C-alpha cells in the first residue's frame, strides 16, 4: 500500500522530475485508487492531468478505480423547468454525473463522502474483492495436499 502526493496544479518545471520520482511505486502497484474531489469545479481536468502523468511514467495500463470523494460538498445549478437551453456541466446533478461516469468506466468508479462516511462499506467491499483477485493463494496440484486433507478429515 502506498499513498502518493495529491493533485498539484502548475508545478514548477524544476520540480516535475522529483514529483514524478515519487510516483515510481505506481509502476509496481497491482491496483491504483485515483481519489478525486468531485466538488472541485475542475475535477475533470484534474483527472486528465493525472491520467497523462500515469501514462508518462508507465503506469497508465494499471487497473484503476476512480473514487469520487466529497459527494456531500457537490453542488449544481438547477435549471428552471421551462428553460430549453442545453444543460451545461454546472447544471448536471450528482445522479446524472454518476450515470455518465459509470457508463464511461464500466462501473470502475465509486462515489463516496469520507466525511459523512457515505458508501464507505461499498468502498471496503470493492477493495477487498479487487485485492482478492490479485492475491489468491494457489497451491500446486499434487498428492501431498490430498494427504493432508485426508489426515485432517479422518480425525
Task: For each feature predicted by the language model, list its residue ranges.
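Generic enzyme active-site microenvironment
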Residues: 1, 35, 67
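Walker B catalytic acidic pair
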Residues: 4, 38, 70
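A conditional alpha-helix N-cap/helix-loop micro-motif detector
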Residues: 12-15, 47
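Inter-motif core of Ras-like GTPase G domains
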Residues: 15-40, 52-60
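C-terminal-of-GTPase-core extension/linker across diverse P-loop GTPases
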Residues: 41-155
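Glycine-/small-residue-rich active-site loops that bind phosphorylated ligands and cofactors
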Residues: 7, 39-42
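Switch I (G2) and immediately adjacent beta-strands of P-loop GTPase domains
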Residues: 1-10, 31
Amino acid at each position: 500500500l502506498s499513498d502518493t502526493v495529491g493533485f498539484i496544479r502548475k508545478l514548477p518545471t524544476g520540480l516535475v522530475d522529483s514529483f514524478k520520482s515519487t510516483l515510481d511505486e505506481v509502476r509496481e502497484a497491482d491496483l491504483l485508487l485515483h481519489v478525486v474531489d468531485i466538488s472541485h469545479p475542475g475535477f475533470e481536468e484534474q483527472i486528465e492531468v493525472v491520467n497523462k502523468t500515469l501514462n508518462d511514467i508507465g503506469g497508465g495500463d494499471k487497473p484503476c478505480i476512480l473514487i469520487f470523494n466529497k459527494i456531500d460538498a457537490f453542488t449544481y445549478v438547477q435549471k428552471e423547468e421551462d428553460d430549453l437551453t442545453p444543460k451545461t456541466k454546472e447544471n448536471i446533478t450528482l445522479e446524472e454525473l454518476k450515470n455518465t461516469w459509470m457508463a464511461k468506466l464500466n462501473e470502475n468508479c465509486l462515489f463516496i463522502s469520507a466525511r459523512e462516511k457515505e458508501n464507505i462499506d461499498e468502498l471496503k467491499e470493492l477493495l477487498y474483492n479487487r485485492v482478492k483477485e490479485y492475491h489468491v493463494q494457489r497451491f500446486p496440484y499434487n498428492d501431498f495436499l490430498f494427504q493432508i486433507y485426508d489426515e485432517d478429515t479422518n480425525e
